[in-house]
Amino acid sequence: MPHFDCLIVGGGHAGAQAAILLRQLKFEGTVGLISGETEYPYERPPLSKDYLAGEKIFDRILLRPRNFWGDQGIELFLGERVKALQPAEHSLTTASGAEFTYGKLIWAGGGVARRLSCPGGTAKGLFTVRTRADVDAVMAVLPQAERFAIVGGGYIGLEAAAVLSKLGKQVTLIEALDRVLARVAGPELSAFFEDEHRAHGVDVRLACGVEAIEADEQDRATGVRLADGTIIPTDAVIVGIGIVPETGPLLLAGASGGNGVDVDEYCLTSLPDVYAIGDCAAHENRFAEGRRVRVESVQNANDQARTAVQHIIGTPAPYDAVPWFWSNQYDLRLQTVGLAVAHDERVVRGDPATRSFSVVYLRQGHVVALDCVNRTKDYVQGRALVVDGTRVDRDRLADADTPLKELTAAQG
């Protein structure tokens, strides 16, 4: 039975970064990493962008060269999924029957793409965009498929729509809510991206629930039936409706949690010597008014990896990183800092018609987040306003010619 001083579950950004940091910070114990995927750790953001577009080959999105892991004394177990955890024994079992013991365990299981639960939801020709295998499957049908229906108007759906539109495909994007990005951004940003996608030929359908997937005699998807009975003919369907956190073994072993596994400020779960980081970790975040949230981003994965590793090596520092995120669509670069979940006011800097503007989110007059489209200077300078929760003068904030670094606290 292999034993590791630190065993990591998950080969995504969080798990890989934890392994990298253990060695960078001179952890001398044994390190193992178990991943359900058969691939060496790789970047996920390019999957719905450059990789899907065929602009980057897989080797260019590897997080490290293949020989790095062995050279660093990090043992990889690829294609293995953890089935059960025995916290009292500090051991776990994989689906193949392999058993491991550990001193410390870092759970970076991430999540699996959420599937449609409607009739026809298991038909052939339905795809997700979560793993390399997912995107390879989409790319395999590109030569034959001309009509794509994308279910979900979040970032994954919008990025996939942009790539497919640029490839000359006929794209219909279906969103259940009344605007895209409704869960993460204000209506100004939603309207801007809706207009952009329509200008590029995407048929954007809002407030449309999916009733069923139509399929032929071979159980291959031929259309998406909406709640009002409308059928969108399609050759392929991409489902981008979020993820389900991969935390089953932890919760079954008694860890606290629900939508994710609960962690404290050092990324420790309620189980002894077990940490959780990345997409699956529900933590209290001061940028969300102290609410317990899961943040699905590379930033969160990397920063929580550092928090867990520093605690393991005896230099603890509580997690307090400012959230940030980016999205590329067409020739647009969106950069986000902070969390807009609890804002009560928005100020727009610049004119969206120029395709260069920012939306600043306030709570009781204090800056809590920014969405910046083709406006990197606002993103860079606005970060400090978010970190400090700066109270700003709204008139100066709305003046696009006033650098954010010059804003001073409003009086009164």
UniProtKB/Swiss-Prot annotation:
Disruption phenotype: Disruption mutant shows growth defect on DDVA. The lineage of its organism: Bacteria, Pseudomonadati, Pseudomonadota, Alphaproteobacteria, Sphingomonadales. GO terms for cellular component: cytoplasm. Monomer. The three-component monooxygenase is composed of an oxygenase (LigXa), a ferredoxin (LigXc) and a ferredoxin reductase (LigXd). It catalyses: 5,5'-dehydrodivanillate + NADH + O2 + H(+) = 2,2',3-trihydroxy-3'-methoxy-5,5'-dicarboxybiphenyl + formaldehyde + NAD(+) + H2O. Its cofactor is FAD. Belongs to the FAD-dependent oxidoreductase family. This is 5,5'-dehydrodivanillate O-demethylase ferredoxin reductase subunit.
